UniProtKB/Swiss-Prot annotation:
A Gene Ontology molecular function term of the record: ATP binding
Record note on quaternary structure: Homodimer.
Function: Aspartyl-tRNA synthetase with relaxed tRNA specificity since it is able to aspartylate not only its cognate tRNA(Asp) but also tRNA(Asn). Reaction proceeds in two steps: L-aspartate is first activated by ATP to form Asp-AMP and then transferred to the acceptor end of tRNA(Asp/Asn).
Designated name of the protein: Aspartate--tRNA(Asp/Asn) ligase
Residues bound to L-aspartate: E176, R222, H452, R497
Gene Ontology CC terms, in alphabetical order: cytoplasm
Source taxonomy: Bacteria, Pseudomonadati, Pseudomonadota, Alphaproteobacteria, Rickettsiales
Gene: aspS
Species in which this protein is naturally found: Rickettsia akari (strain Hartford)
GO biological process annotation, one example: aspartyl-tRNA aminoacylation
Region (Aspartate) location: 200-203
Binding residues for ATP: R222, D223, E224, E490, G542, I543, D544, R545
Location in the cell: Cytoplasm
């Protein structure tokens, strides 16, 4: 017989009755019934009930003292449970093991939190003792699901002719939109590597190298703040690139992968392919977001022209100063109490709005609300037609500069969807957001900057860049850039790449980069493009976010084995941490006085 186990804890069935077995695992639960002690033994695979009887008093007494989460090896005989003790919630629920011997392989200390329930413990405690947290069923299953998803992705990609690669982790800094994690070089004092924010340049270089279809389950590193759907520090993406493709080719390649993946790992309804295509400007108008949740049926409308000549002075004056007005319908909300409308106004103000106007349309067509009395019958009819409002509905209004008004309307739309329970249940709604602006104004400097990926191809190519003589014209340029969105979560950005050096130099010069700086920062790729680069494009869906959706987790840390906390700290391994002066000296690094003072405190 094996030293530790003949079976796992999910394996034994009624057909095994009478068999002598050996099992190893963790003490999940213990119940003392006087003349019987029951232990639920748990391993990676499941749970089985172990029984200790008073036929062996010493063994039963020893079992009654076992601490939860101690690791034990048990030898015994499989017996059938009586009819009234069968547990149909367990695969092993028709049998139990009558113990004749057990060995404590490793005794557990007092637990910092309970393992055998899903009751929440403080997150910092969970992360500090992640090895315990990972034993909990839900989190344990999430990590198994993650492995299964990645394995299936590999199968799907290889079936489509993609080759898996590994690209460097130590590389050069690249403007991907976030801060780099820098790694000092001992051999080259004063110089630094950067951990890749994405394998962007390398995957493009592989296309130039003659490989046709690349993919990688790629680790990416970005020094950015945490969010519910974004883990600080490190994340993984399904990174892919293809040669000789158009935007539609990329869509038609990744859509069946997403459809197959979500259908395999969920029973929920998944959007049929092809997924809906929504241009960026249309998305910002209709949904107030570039990552719309299409489960929400509310459509935002622009009603600026209706209010331009109205008697509602506040909106009329805002419009005269360059603002717009957006209408957000609230279906069947006309009869909601005043507290509902007050609550919505408070929410809008908390999001930065100056206020939130509204009108209620009764089932008979009568209006209620401060805004209504300033609109003529013709204007009210026009409003109902433009915003698709029916009797029995309400409608909210925001007025501000275009970008802010769009964002505020989007926030109100999301909140209304939640408050009115409008989201379609049990479904995954996919869409593509296309035609992103190539440039944007940097909020801090007021200068032209890339809006997303600087390596994307501008629509219209070099001619479009050269003909855009004003800031306004530059901001109207679009890129062959796209996002795939599911249930309001951006899963990925992608683009058809700029593979022509002359267009790249021009695009970067508009964003304030000299040719010398471009050569210095992207010399390897620019040089490669001068030796025959194929048209190419790609995308990189986020693995963590995909798993988060399929696991129905509310926080991305629930699908990562060892995540950082919201302050980008690893509480288990105590990172980041100060290092010895000797190590800093080898790297030619000197701490600032304030940092040195903090280091001495530790």
């Amino acid at each position: 017989m094996h030293k530790y186990r003949t079976h796992n804890c999910s394996e034994l069935q009624i057909s095994d009755v009478g068999q002598e077995v050996k099992l190893s695992g963790w003490v999940h639960r213990r119940r003392d019934h006087g003349n019987l002690v029951f232990i639920d033994l748990r391993d990676h695979y499941g749970i089985i009930q172990i029984v200790f009887t008073d036929q062996n008093p010493q063994l039963m007494e020893d079992a009654s003292r076992l601490r939860y989460e101690s690791v034990v090896t048990v030898r015994g005989t499989v017996v059938a449970r009586s009819e009234d003790t069968i547990n149909n919630t367990l695969p092993t629920g028709h049998v139990e093991v009558l113990a004749v011997e057990f060995i404590v392989e490793s005794a557990a200390d007092t637990l910092p939190f309970v393992i055998n329930t899903e009751k929440d413990a403080p997150e910092d405690s969970r992360l500090k003792h992640r090895f315990l947290d990972l034993r909990r069923e839900k989190l344990h299953n999430n990590i198994i699901l993650r492995s299964q998803i990645i394995s299936h992705i590999r199968h799907l990609m290889m079936a489509r002719g993609f080759t898996e690669f590994q690209t460097p982790i130590l590389t050069a800094s690249s403007p991907e939109g976030a801060r780099d994690f820098l790694v000092p070089s001992r051999m080259h004092p004063g110089k630094f590597y950067a951990l890749p924010q994405a394998p962007q340049q390398f995957k493009q270089l592989l296309m130039v190298s003659g490989f046709d279809r690349y993919f990688q389950i790629a680790p990416c590193f970005r020094d950015e703040d945490a969010r519910a759907d974004r883990s600080p520090g490190e994340f993984y993406q399904l990174d892919l690139e293809m040669s000789f493709v158009t935007q539609e080719d990329v869509f038609s390649t990744i859509e069946p992968v997403m459809y197959d993946l979500f259908n395999k790992f969920t029973d929920k309804k998944v959007s049929a392919t092809p997924f809906v295509r929504i241009p960026y400007n249309e998305s910002m108008l209709k949904y107030g977001s570039d990552k719309p949740d299409l489960r929400n049926t509310i459509i935002i409308s622009d009603v600026t022209e209706i209010f331009r000549d109205s008697d509602f002075t506040i909106f009329r004056e805002n419009i005269r100063k360059g603002s717009i007005v957006r209408a957000i319908p609230a279906p069947k909300a006309a009869t909601m109490p005043r507290s509902f409308f007050d609550k919505m106004i408070e929410f809008a103000i908390s999001e930065g709005a100056g206020g939130l106007g509204y009108i209620q349309f009764s089932e008979t067509g009568e209006t209620k609300g401060a805004v209504a009395k300033f609109l003529s019958t013709q204007q009210l009819d026009s409003l109902k037609a433009t915003a698709s409002i029916s009797n029995g509905d309400a409608v909210f209004f925001v007025s501000d500069k275009k970008e802010k008004a769009a964002r505020l309307a989007g926030k109100v739309r999301i909140r209304l969807g939640e408050e009115l329970d409008l989201l379609e249940k049990d479904c995954f709604k996919f869409c593509w957001i296309t035609d992103f602006p190539f440039y944007e104004l940097n909020e801090e400097t007021g200068k032209i900057d890339f809006s997303h990926n600087p390596f994307s191809m501008p629509q219209g190519g070099l001619e479009a860049l050269e003909n855009a003589k004003t800031t306004e014209a530059l901001l109207e340029l679009n890129a062959y850039q796209y996002d795939i969105v599911c249930n309001g979560i951006e899963l990925s950005s992608g683009a058809i790449r700029n593979h022509k050096p002359d267009i790249m130099y021009k695009a970067f010069s508009i964003a304030g980069y000299s040719e010398e700086e471009v050569n210095k920062r992207f010399g390897g790729m620019i040089r490669a493009f001068k030796f025959g680069a194929p048209p190419h494009g790609g995308i990189a869906p986020g693995i963590d976010r995909i798993v988060m959706l399929l696991a129905e987790a509310t926080n991305i840390r629930e699908v990562i084995a060892f995540p950082l906390n919201q302050q980008a700290e690893d509480l288990l391994m105590n990172a980041p941490s100060y290092v010895e002066d000797k190590a800093l000296k080898e790297l030619s690094i000197m701490l600032s006085p304030s940092a040195r003072k903090n280091a001495k405190k530790e």
